[in-house]
């Protein structure tokens, strides 16, 4: 099973991806990152990358352009592959 971090989880695409991933058996959301207040029953949500643990197989990014640099710094620093949306 792949563990994913969902960047931009509070946005429209983030919420859609959350609902689609919840239906799958081969992956799960390990954490979400979004500066907007958001609560999920399924995974912890962090307001910034400094708080997010790096225990993931990949990052799905549907955040705003302003969130791209911190996310890429986190991903490259921890060797985590990224899918940009």
Language model segments and positions:
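Glycine/small-residue-rich loop that forms an oxyanion/phosphate-binding "nest" at active or ligand-binding sites
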Residues: 52, 56-85
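NAD(P)-binding Rossmann-fold cofactor-contacting core
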Residues: 20-42
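Conserved Rossmann-like nucleotide-cofactor binding loop
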Residues: 12, 38, 65
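N-terminal Rossmann NAD(P)H-binding glycine-rich loop of SDR-like oxidoreductase domains
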Residues: 6-19
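Extreme N-terminal starter segment of soluble prokaryotic enzymes
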Residues: 1-5
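Short acidic low-complexity segments
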Residues: 28-29, 41-55
